[in-house]
Amino acid sequence: MRTFNFLSFPQVHRQALVKAVLVAIATVSLLLTSDVINPQSAQAYPFWAQQTAPETPREATGRIVCANCHLAQKPAEIEIPHSVLPDSVFEAVVKIPYDPASQQVLGDGSKGGLNVGAVLMLPDGFKIAPPDRIPEEMQEKLGGVYFQSYKEGQDNVVIVGPLPGDQYKEIVFPVLAPDPSQNKGIHFGKYAVHLGANRGRGQVYPTGEPSNNNAFKASTAGTISQISKTEAGGYEVTITSEAGPVVENIPAGPELIVSEGQAIEVGQFLTSNPNVGGFGQKDTEVVLQNPGRIKGLVLFLGGIMLCQILLVIKKKQVETVQAAEMNF
């Protein structure tokens, strides 16, 4: 049997082999440690929106797709400057108001605090500012929020969440404005900005199935003959109808508002509505201002003021001359 002798290889081949082994080791190490060093904490939300609408979160009707699962309407606010200069960093402040005393139904049926999340659709060319461009004062307002692009290569559509609502009723987005002198595809002018913000869990999964953060209705008319509690904490409500018994499965979380022996109609609520959250949408505008126009406006206004001053001085001179002639 011939034994492998590494030294028998030519020096050039040995160097190439060593380099390939080192590259392979480095690649494997990077793959194994990337999740530890840089965990993708934001993948939990908005996973559903990205899966159901992978290209854009805004439908042709103008509605943000989050509204398909978060059925309740709640307010959402955004504050941005009316106009910004090229290559400048500004704040886009998103406000998601709700009652801090509210408790939502969690997946296991227990109660807990509300989470918040938002999707911000900026104009083309606008994006989250890199860390070295964010002022120190603005850094303090961010609070360690992780900003994620909705789609790879689409930096102007940004998503955050889920975040604890009691800490992030206001979310500050550090936005970097584009520079038309560096990007010929960007032009000065007015642009639309779209915001979608939610608080709490959704009522419908993308598959169409209702979550336990929902009110459940009777699928048939009849009389409730039996109510049984399940091991998971929910209920099985048996409705005796003309076609036979029908069992309604209700997960843990919603509270029953019916009782055995009660006659019900189709579509009648069997539970209360536990949802305390909701989704809000807000549209606004931002102007990418041309610095040259601002300078021109300043010069124009300065010229007008100078003319007015000269006219006042000239008027005083005329009045002085007229007064002197009258005295003469």
UniProtKB/Swiss-Prot annotation:
<keyword id="KW-0812">Transmembrane</keyword>
<feature type="binding site" description="axial binding residue">
    <location>
        <position position="45"/>
    </location>
    <ligand>
        <name>heme</name>
    </ligand>
</feature>
<protein>
    <recommendedName>
        <fullName>Cytochrome f</fullName>
    </recommendedName>
</protein>
<comment type="similarity">
    <text>Belongs to the cytochrome f family.</text>
</comment>
<dbReference type="GO" id="GO:0015979">
    <property type="term" value="P:photosynthesis"/>
</dbReference>
<keyword id="KW-0732">Signal</keyword>
<dbReference type="GO" id="GO:0020037">
    <property type="term" value="F:heme binding"/>
</dbReference>
<dbReference type="Pfam" id="PF01333">
    <property type="entry name" value="Apocytochr_F_C"/>
</dbReference>
<feature type="binding site" description="covalent">
    <location>
        <position position="69"/>
    </location>
    <ligand>
        <name>heme</name>
    </ligand>
</feature>
<feature type="signal peptide">
    <location>
        <begin position="1"/>
        <end position="44"/>
    </location>
</feature>
<keyword id="KW-0349">Heme</keyword>
<keyword id="KW-0408">Iron</keyword>
<keyword id="KW-0479">Metal-binding</keyword>
<dbReference type="InterPro" id="IPR024058">
    <property type="entry name" value="Cyt-f_TM"/>
</dbReference>
<dbReference type="InterPro" id="IPR024094">
    <property type="entry name" value="Cyt_f_lg_dom"/>
</dbReference>
<feature type="binding site" description="covalent">
    <location>
        <position position="66"/>
    </location>
    <ligand>
        <name>heme</name>
    </ligand>
</feature>
<dbReference type="Pfam" id="PF16639">
    <property type="entry name" value="Apocytochr_F_N"/>
</dbReference>
<dbReference type="GO" id="GO:0009055">
    <property type="term" value="F:electron transfer activity"/>
</dbReference>
<keyword id="KW-0472">Membrane</keyword>
<feature type="binding site" description="axial binding residue">
    <location>
        <position position="70"/>
    </location>
    <ligand>
        <name>heme</name>
    </ligand>
</feature>
<comment type="subunit">
    <text>The 4 large subunits of the cytochrome b6-f complex are cytochrome b6, subunit IV (17 kDa polypeptide, PetD), cytochrome f and the Rieske protein, while the 4 small subunits are PetG, PetL, PetM and PetN. The complex functions as a dimer.</text>
</comment>
<dbReference type="GO" id="GO:0005506">
    <property type="term" value="F:iron ion binding"/>
</dbReference>
<keyword id="KW-0602">Photosynthesis</keyword>
<keyword id="KW-0813">Transport</keyword>
<dbReference type="GO" id="GO:0031676">
    <property type="term" value="C:plasma membrane-derived thylakoid membrane"/>
</dbReference>
<dbReference type="InterPro" id="IPR036826">
    <property type="entry name" value="Cyt_f_lg_dom_sf"/>
</dbReference>
<dbReference type="InterPro" id="IPR011054">
    <property type="entry name" value="Rudment_hybrid_motif"/>
</dbReference>
<keyword id="KW-0793">Thylakoid</keyword>
<feature type="transmembrane region" description="Helical">
    <location>
        <begin position="294"/>
        <end position="314"/>
    </location>
</feature>
<dbReference type="InterPro" id="IPR002325">
    <property type="entry name" value="Cyt_f"/>
</dbReference>
<keyword id="KW-1133">Transmembrane helix</keyword>
<comment type="function">
    <text>Component of the cytochrome b6-f complex, which mediates electron transfer between photosystem II (PSII) and photosystem I (PSI), cyclic electron flow around PSI, and state transitions.</text>
</comment>
<keyword id="KW-0249">Electron transport</keyword>
